[in-house]
Curated annotation (Swiss-Prot):
<keyword id="KW-0234">DNA repair</keyword>
<dbReference type="Pfam" id="PF14826">
    <property type="entry name" value="FACT-Spt16_Nlob"/>
</dbReference>
<feature type="coiled-coil region">
    <location>
        <begin position="768"/>
        <end position="789"/>
    </location>
</feature>
<feature type="compositionally biased region" description="Acidic residues">
    <location>
        <begin position="962"/>
        <end position="994"/>
    </location>
</feature>
<feature type="region of interest" description="Disordered">
    <location>
        <begin position="492"/>
        <end position="519"/>
    </location>
</feature>
<dbReference type="GO" id="GO:0006368">
    <property type="term" value="P:transcription elongation by RNA polymerase II"/>
</dbReference>
<dbReference type="Pfam" id="PF00557">
    <property type="entry name" value="Peptidase_M24"/>
</dbReference>
<protein>
    <recommendedName>
        <fullName>FACT complex subunit SPT16</fullName>
    </recommendedName>
</protein>
<dbReference type="Pfam" id="PF21091">
    <property type="entry name" value="SPT16_C"/>
</dbReference>
<dbReference type="InterPro" id="IPR033825">
    <property type="entry name" value="Spt16_M24"/>
</dbReference>
<dbReference type="GO" id="GO:0006260">
    <property type="term" value="P:DNA replication"/>
</dbReference>
<keyword id="KW-0175">Coiled coil</keyword>
<feature type="region of interest" description="Disordered">
    <location>
        <begin position="942"/>
        <end position="1055"/>
    </location>
</feature>
<feature type="compositionally biased region" description="Basic and acidic residues">
    <location>
        <begin position="492"/>
        <end position="504"/>
    </location>
</feature>
<dbReference type="InterPro" id="IPR040258">
    <property type="entry name" value="Spt16"/>
</dbReference>
<dbReference type="InterPro" id="IPR013719">
    <property type="entry name" value="RTT106/SPT16-like_middle_dom"/>
</dbReference>
<comment type="function">
    <text>Component of the FACT complex, a general chromatin factor that acts to reorganize nucleosomes. The FACT complex is involved in multiple processes that require DNA as a template such as mRNA elongation, DNA replication and DNA repair. During transcription elongation the FACT complex acts as a histone chaperone that both destabilizes and restores nucleosomal structure.</text>
</comment>
Amino acid sequence: MADNGDAKGGSGAYAINIENFSKRLKVFYDHWKEHKSDLWGSSDAIAIATPPPSDDLRYLKSSALDIWLLGYEFPETIIVFMHKQIHVLSSQKKGNLIGTLKKAANEAVGVDIVLHVKTKNSDGADLMDDIVHAARNQSKSDKPVVGHIAKEAPEGKLLETWIKKLSGSGLRLVDVTNGFSELFAVKDTTEITCVKKAAYLTSSVLKNFVIPKLEKVIDEEKEVSHSSLMDDAEKAILDPLKVKVKLKPDNVDICYPPVFQSGGKFDLKPGASSNDEYLYYDSASIIICAIGSKYSSYCSNVARTYLIDATPTQNKAYETLRKAHEAAIQQVKPGNQMSAVYQAAVAVIERDAPELLPNLTKSAGTGIGLEFRESGLNLNAKNDRRIKKGMVFNVSLGLHNIQAETTSEKTKQFSLLLADTVLVNERGHEILTAPCSKAFKDVAYSFNEDDDAVAAEVKIKSKTIDVMPTKATLRSDNQEMSKEELRRQHQAELARQKNEETARRLAGVGTGSGDGRGPARASNELVAYKNVNDVPFVRDLVIQVDQKNEAVLLPIYGSMVPFHVSTVKSVTSHQDNRTCTIRIFFNVPGMPFSNDSKFNSQGAIYLKEITFRSKDPRHSSEVVQQIKTLRRQVASRESERAERATLVTQEKLQIGSNRMKMMRLSDVWIRPAFGGRGRKLTGNLEAHFNGFRYSTSRSDERVDIMFGNIKHAFFQPAEKEMITLLHFHLHNHIMVGNKKTKDVQFYVEVMDVVQTLGGSRRSALDPDEIEEEQRERDRKNRINMDFQNFVNKVNDHWSQPQFKGLDLEFDVPLRELGFHGVPYKASAFIIPTSTCLVELIETPFLVVSLSEIEIVNLERVGFGTKNFDMAIVFKDFKKDVLRIDSIPSASLDAIKEWLDTTDLKYYESRLNLNWRPILKTIIDDPQKFIDDGGWEFLNMEASDSETEDTEESDQGYVPSDAEPESESEDDDSDSESLVESDDDDEESDEDSEEEKGKTWEELEREASNADREHGAESDSEEERRRRKAKTFGKSRAPERSSFKGAPPSKKPKFR
C-alpha cells in the first residue's frame, strides 16, 4: 500500500489522513451531485471493486480512487457509495482501518459508513446481498442505477462473485469512468506537491545519472544493452540518494520500466519497452530515453532524444520537433481547449517542415497524476474539453519512422521523442521537468566535427557491427599522423575563418568618442555658502576651516573670504626659524591635466596661489592638516558620486517566497569588502525571484545582484585552495560599499587557523594531529556540499522559461587544464572553464570571456626557454591586450591543445610584440591589414610552405608607423621581419663556417671597416645602439647572430 500524505488518524502501522479524507469525500459527493446526469450516468449508487494485488505495473481507476480518498490501495475491497451510506466489504484488518473514518464521513457529507467484514474462507455472497438490498432501499427508482468502472475486468473470487451478484440483481449498471477522470483531473495543493517531487526525481535521474552513464558508455566504447541501462536507471529511481535527491525510498516507485531505444528500432507508444540489443552509438545514430517516476503514487514523465554526429536531415527534424513541442506547451494554459495544444504543434510542422507531418504522433500527450495516462485528458485534435488550473499534463510529441540519407540498416530510419511534465497554474503553466534541457546544443554529440579532415581525432566505432576493412585501413594510415599535425590542420582552418570574421567586423567598425569619464561637477556647483549672511563671524583674522560647509576661510584685505575645499589643489607648510609659511594652490583653467569644462565662467578671474606667514607653528600645522583631511574626504565622496553616475540603472529585486528563501548561504564573506573602519562581518547570500541579495547585520551593508546583469557565474570548490567560492562577473558595474566593480565574489574559508600552544612539533601519527586533519577534511567537505546544494537549486531556478534568454548556469573551473602565470603582478594559478579563462583566488580577479577573444599569441616560444608569455588580443581592438607572463614551458602543449579544442586561433613568436601600435595600425588602415593576409603576419611557419617566387609577398602583415627610407632598406628588411625563413638559417650556417676561428676583436675590426666602406664611418657606437632600439620599437625581430658561439642576447620585452 502506498502512503499519500501525512498520517493523522487510525492506529497500527497504517493510518489514514482524516483531514484529506474529509475534504476529498466532500469534493466527490459535490461533484457527483453536480454532474450526476452527464458524467455519472444518473447513478443512484457507485460501486468500486479493487482487485487483488499484482506484481505487474498497472493503472486502475479503482486503485486510484482508494489512494486519492484513503491514501492507500485497498485490494480485494468493495466500496459502494450511496447518498446516505457508504458500504464497505473487506477483511477484518482493512475494515478496522476504515472504521476510524465513521465520524469524519458523517461530519463531512452526512453519510454513515457500514462495514461488512468477510471471513477468510468466505466468498462474501451473503454480505453482497445485504449491500444490494441497501442500494434498492435507498433509491427512489424501481430499478436503481449503479455506476461502476466497466473497463476493469473482475479478478479473483471475490470480484467475480460481486459481478455475478450485480448482474443478477436486476440493477441497471452504467459506466462512470468519465466521472472519475473529471474528478481526478484537477489536483489540490497536496497532490501538486507530490507531482512536483516526482518530477524533480525524474529529471534528477535523467540529468545526474542517465546522461553521465550514456556519455561514459560512449566515451569508453562499451557494449551495454538497452535492458541493462533500464535496470540501472530503475535502481537509481528507487534509491533517490544516488542522484542526490532527499526523498524516502518507501515513497518512490517507477511509472514504467525506463525506456532506452537506439539502432533504428523505435516505438513511441506509451507501453514501449527496452530490448536486449546493445546501445548503438555510431555516426548518425539516435538514442531515445524516457524516464517516469512516482512519488506517493503520483506520476511524472520526461523523454529526451540524443543525436550522435547527426546528419542535416536529423538536425532539421529535431529542431522542428523541439519548436513544435515548445509551441504545444505554450498552449497549456487555463481556458484553452485541449485540442489547441496539438493544433499548435501541427502548425509549426506545417510551417517549417510539412514533409514531416505524416510522421507526427496523433496526440500531444495526456493528463498525468495517479494514472500515467488519464485518458479523459487526451491532447489530440478532437478533444474540446477546457484546460483548468491544477491540471497536470504529460506533453509528449514525437516523429516516427523518418527516412535518413544513410544506407546503414541501423540509421536509415529514425524516430524522435520529447516529453515534459507540465503543471497548469494561474500564470499559465510550469514545466516541472525543465532542468532536463532539450536545446540542440545539450542533446547533440559530435565526435567528428571536421568533416574535411583526413581523420578525426576522436572516432566512435560501432560496437554492434563488424568494423569495415576501409575503416581499419584509414586508422592504420593515420597512425603516423601526430596530434600536432591534426592541430596544425585545424588551426589553418581557424586562421581562414578568423581572417574572414575580422574582415567583416572591421568593415563595419566605428570610431568611439569620449574618454569614458563620468560627468564632472562644474565650478559654479561648488557653493559653500548661499549668501554672505551664512558666512560665520570670525573675530580673529586667521585661517579657519569650516567642516560643516566644507569651506576654507582665508583673511584677505581684512575680510574672511570663503573658498570651497574642492577648489584647493594642494596645501603646503614650511617652517623657517620662528616663521611658518602656508602656501595654498587652487584649481584654475589652463593647468596641465585639468578639466576646463568644469569652469563655466571662462571670463572670470581665478586665484591661483596664496601665501600666508604665521608665528604660531602649532596653529599652522593644524590648519594644514584640517584642509588636507577635509579635501580628502570631499574628493572621496565626489569620486564615489561620479562613479555612481556612470552606473547602469538596475531592475528592482523581487523578494522571493518562503520556499525561495531556502536558497541561502549563511556566514559568507564578500569581495570586494565593504568600506569603513569597523570590524568586518560575514553575511548571508539569498537567491530571490530575479536576483541575489547579500546582507550583513549592519543595515547599510547590502548588495543586490540581478540575474539579468550576470555575464558569467562560477562555482569553485576548495580542493588545493583555502576557500570555496561563488563568483559573479557582471555586464555592468555595481557599487559594493563605495567601490565600483564588475566582479563580486562570495566565499568561505574551509580551514580554521589553529595555533599549537605546546610549541613542540607533533608526529604525523599523533592521534591529535590525525583527528585535527580529519576535522579539517570534514569541514571542507561540508562547506563544499553546502555550496553545491545552493548552486544546484539556483541552476534549477535559472532553468525556468523566464530566464531562458539569460543562458545562465554556474561554471566550474577545470583544474586539470590549469597553468601558472603572471596576469598582473604576482604569479597565480589560472584555470580555464567551458566559457572563460579565470583566476578567482588572488586579487585582482581575472575573468576573460572566450567569446570576446580574437586571437592568442604565444610569445618567447623557443628551444631552451623555461617559460613563455601569452598575449590575448580581444575582438574590440580598442581594448588593451591582456598579457599573462612567465608561463612554464611545460604547460605549452597543454595550452595549445586547450586553445585548439575551444576553436581559438593561436600563433607563436620568438619575441614579445608591442601591440598598441600594431592594433592602432589595423584600426587606421583595416583594408591594408586584410589585403596583406590578416593575422598571418604572426605565422612563423608561413614561409616554410611557400616557394621562393612568393616568399616576399607571403611575409605577412607587419604593422609599422614609419615609412621606408629607401629601397635598400626594403631589400634588407627580411632579416628584421617577424617571420624568419629557413633561408636565413642556411645563410647563418654558411657565415658561421666562414667566420669560424676568428676572435671577437677581429670581428669587431672587420665590422668597423665595412661601415667605413659604406660611408657610415661617422656613426658612433651610441648612434648604432639608438638606431637598433628604434628598430626594435617597431616590433621587428633582431638580426640573427652570424657566427656560432656567440652569447645569447637578452630579448627586450615590450607591452
